[in-house]
From Swiss-Prot:
The protein's name in its UniProt record: Queuine tRNA-ribosyltransferase
Positions in coiled-coil regions: none
Organism encoding this protein: Clostridium botulinum (strain Langeland / NCTC 10281 / Type F)
Subunit-structure text: Homodimer. Within each dimer, one monomer is responsible for RNA recognition and catalysis, while the other monomer binds to the replacement base PreQ1.
Biological process according to GO: queuosine biosynthetic process; tRNA wobble guanine modification; tRNA-guanine transglycosylation
Pathway recorded for this protein: tRNA modification; tRNA-queuosine biosynthesis
Length: 376
């Protein structure tokens, strides 16, 4: 259940109550594709840096170790030792982005595994069954994510199919939640708005799925080739047509400036691999924007990554030392930078929540964008 606590302009401060705890929103979900954050970051680390929600990937966990294995181990929460909310995506995005060979039909999608090439089928019911086996807190509906730009006629047909798939997802989720051997029989379902960059298709689809009384709603199919201006235009068009008493999730968007702009437009949930991926390559976020620790100017820099930051890396190590670790190819380098970036993101969301609570979000947003100077 979502409770709207405060608004500052269109920015929303809320609480989302789930079977695994209350999520304070706006929130950034830390992406652990295979039930782990890449960069040697543990579930204990995630708690220390303030992570509220972990996101795992249905497609990848279905292939490795297999959702049946996870179910036999008691579900994702027990498997990875995490007692806070977990969101699993439906696998749809990976099916359409990773599979070179795929065939879309009404019942679902036939595709080849990116690991061993074997033929796999996934449709709405299969996605729900896999996510039920994983026993995540929130399951995402199975949808088709089209590339931007895509021909209007194709997008229209795709959205109609995605809507039919959503009805099938909801029916299957209700069935699974009623079974005696289901680990999490209170699993929640979010629907996904699609429609490419066509505002009218997006709006009509938002109106359609809003009637389905789902636990939350996502805006999908963005950050896949369109400009930031197009992204903001679509968010502006869609948000007013989604229920105000449900959380809104902007999928896969994680550039800090994009997060601020989306919060300003009423978005509550975010996820992205960006902080961990950047951290593994020595790109770290600071109050002044993103920096690359491999640059020669940091060789003798005795400052922490970001002065004033309370993350484990900044409290104990210098830029010079971490740069040395990267040059020496020590795994600790990646771990420290991933920890820092995840802390930066979770701390950013805490500051955003405080700014909405204090009704100064507009001023906060403008100040942060000015400080970052286009570098974050």
């Amino acid at each position: 259940m979502y409770k709207l606590l405060k608004k500052s302009g269109k920015a929303r401060r809320g609480e989302f109550t789930t079977p695994h705890g209350v999520i304070q929103t706006p929130v950034f979900m830390n992406v652990g594709t295979l039930a782990a954050i890449k960069g040697a970051v543990s579930s204990m680390d995630l708690k220390e840096i303030g992570c509220q929600v972990e996101l795992s990937n249905t497609y990848h966990l279905h292939l490795r170790p297999g959702d049946e294995v996870v179910k036999k181990m008691g579900g994702l929460h027990k498997f990875m030792n995490w007692d806070r909310p977990i969101l699993t995506d439906s696998g749809g995005f990976q099916v359409f982005s990773l599979s070179k060979i795929r065939k879309i039909q009404e019942e679902g999608v036939y595709f080849n595994s990116h690991i061993d090439g074997r033929k796999i089928f996934m449709g709405p019911e299969e996605s729900m069954r896999i996510q039920s086996n994983l026993a995540s807190t929130i399951a995402m509906a199975f949808d088709e994510c089209v590339e931007n730009p895509a021909p209007r006629e194709y997008v229209e047909k795709s959205v109609e199919r995605t809507t039919r798939w959503l009805h099938r997802c909801k029916d299957e989720m209700n069935r699974l939640n009623s079974l005696p051997d289901t680990i999490n029989n209170k699993q929640m379902l979010f629907g996904i708005n699609q429609g490419g960059t066509y505002e009218d298709i997006r709006i009509e689809h938002a109106k359609t799925i809003a009637k389905m009384d789902l636990d939350g709603y996502a805006i999908g199919g963005l950050a896949v080739g369109e400009s930031h201006e197009d992204m903001y235009r679509i968010i502006d068009a869609v948000v007013p047509h989604l229920p105000e008493d449900k959380p809104i999730y902007l999928m896969g968007v994680g550039i800090p400036s994009n997060i601020l702009e989306a919060v300003d437009r009423g978005v509550d949930f975010f996820d992205c691999v960006l902080p961990a991926r950047n951290g593994r390559h020595a790109h770290v976020f600071t109050k002044e924007g993103k920096i690359n620790l491999l640059n020669a100017k940091f060789e003798l820099d005795d400052k922490p990554i970001d002065e004033g930051c309370q993350c484990p890396a900044c409290k104990h190590y210098t830029r010079s030392y971490i740069r040395h670790l990267f040059k020496a190819k020590e795994m600790l380098a990646m771990r420290l930078c991933v920890l820092h970036n995840l802390y930066f993101y979770n701390n950013l969301m805490e500051e955003i929540r405080d700014a909405i609570d204090g009704d100064y979000f507009k001023e906060y947003k403008e100040r942060k964008l000015k400080e970052w100077g286009g570098r974050a």
